[in-house]
Design a protein with these regions (language model features):
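Extracellular S/T/G-rich loop segment that most often corresponds to the catalytic His/Ser-adjacent loop
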Residues: 82-164
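Extended, solvent-exposed segments with strong compositional bias
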Residues: 219-223, 281-328, 337-342
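Extended low-complexity, serine/threonine- and proline-enriched intrinsically disordered segments
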Residues: 248-307
Length: 391
């Protein structure tokens, strides 16, 4: 910001956007946080220039961008809605939780969703941002001391810190979309708060949580690029030995996509269609829409037919009873593209960067080692050697 930012009615801060654009468009940065933007709620019929410009840059350079959703959550009606550019489809919109420990909730000031469709689930999640009962402590260089503050502006970089921490810990090169998918995949849900308030849930502050597997859980990560009209078959890690417990399947799929700012309804130019085949190992042709419309949208809210197929982030956990038969289950993922709502030929569509995280959990069952023995092709994430220095 400069002393003249916002003068002469320039409340959209276009001069600030140009400076941010010039830095990020250099391609030198893979991680960035924005705790700044126009002070107004998003609208459904028009994409703000901040959102459109930054979405294109993130897709072009593969940047993991976290954006604070704003601090007007106490306002009435649409005035409490998230603020641009946190409605980006290629970034993580971060709200604030009121506590860092248990019994947490949405901080009252944290702006709420929903976003547009596509980009309906906003905020993407929340993380500790401070409250009257538990301030967020940070260093104030002007005072030269630690002060207690609160706001989504502090929550947003904390979420980015977790993702960057995973990249620093991992000797396995994970792309930024995989880091985003891991954050969403391990978000802690709450029955007390709706998705419009906390998104997918509370993000972890500990990067180790995102890459550690408990004994009763097996998690695999698929990531890379996918050509249009091609498909990826992602095997789900499932034991071939009998067990008598209920189990839970959790999956998260994230992509980065070019956007079409002139068409808010058809804003994303790419999408993924996911088909769940629960008994692929038995040559069973039955399929299931695991990431169905109801997994993304509230049933009482109208949404476009098959709109979830154009979302950039899909996430769901589903519990199965002990007598459910699964045999070598897989997800089939197909990439499709459009331009101004029109179909795009395969030769003109760019390759799509994607990441999918899949977890299976069976309580009181040594699932991790069973999966390691069955799928010898799987490689655990290698961790960098850490050296502790005594002070």
């Amino acid at each position: 910001l400069s002393p003249t930012s916002g003068d002469n009615g320039n409340w959209d801060l276009f001069d600030v956007l140009k400076k941010i654009q010039s830095v990020l468009d250099s391609g030198d940065y893979k991680f960035a946080n924005l705790s700044i933007g126009p002070h107004l709620p998003i609208g459904d019929d028009e994409v703000h220039v901040w959102t459109a410009v930054l979405d294109q840059i993130c897709a072009k350079h593969g940047i993991l961008l976290t954006v604070a959703v704003g601090n007007d959550g106490n306002e009435d009606g649409d005035a409490a809605r998230i603020q641009p550019p946190s409605d980006m489809v290629n970034a993580l919109a971060i709200g604030a939780a009121d506590r860092s420990g248990e019994k947490w909730g949405r901080a009252p000031y944290s702006c709420i969703g929903p976003g547009r469709s596509p980009g309906f689930v906003k905020p993407d999640g929340v993380i500790f941002g401070g409250s009257d009962d538990e301030p967020f402590y940070t260093y104030n260089p002007l005072l030269g001391s630690i002060v207690g503050v609160q706001g989504t502006s502090y929550a947003s970089p904390l979420a980015l810190r977790t993702a960057a921490g995973v990249a620093a810990l991992s000797g396995t090169p994970l792309n930024t979309i995989a880091l985003k998918a891991l954050l969403v995949h391990h978000a802690e849900t709450s029955r007390k708060y709706s998705r419009e308030h906390i998104g997918w849930g509370r993000f972890s502050e500990d990067p180790n949580v995102l890459i550690d597997c408990p004994n009763d859980t097996a998690t695999v990560i698929y990531y890379g690029s996918l050509a249009k009209n091609k498909y990826l078959r992602a095997p789900i890690p499932f034991p071939d030995v009998p067990f008598d417990e209920a189990f839970e399947l959790t999956a998260t799929l994230c992509i980065q996509t070019p956007v079409d700012p002139e068409h808010s309804v058809n804003y994303t130019r790419a999408g993924m269609q996911v088909t769940f085949r629960p008994r692929f190992g038995l040559d069973d042709t039955d399929t299931d829409d695991f990431f169905g419309q109801k997994s993304q949208y509230k049933t009482e809210r109208e949404c476009r037919s098959e709109g979830h197929k154009w979302e950039t982030c899909l996430h769901r956990s589903k519990k199965f009873s002990a007598d459910t038969l699964l045999s070598d289950p897989v997800f089939d993922i197909r990439y499709h593209a459009r331009d101004s709502s029109r179909h795009v030929k395969g030769v003109s569509a760019p390759d799509m960067q994607y990441a999918m995280v899949i977890s299976v959990r069976v309580k009181d069952f040594d699932l991790y080692n069973v999966i390691r023995q069955r799928y010898t092709i799987l490689n655990p994430i290698q961790l960098r050697t850490q050296i502790s220095l005594d002070t």
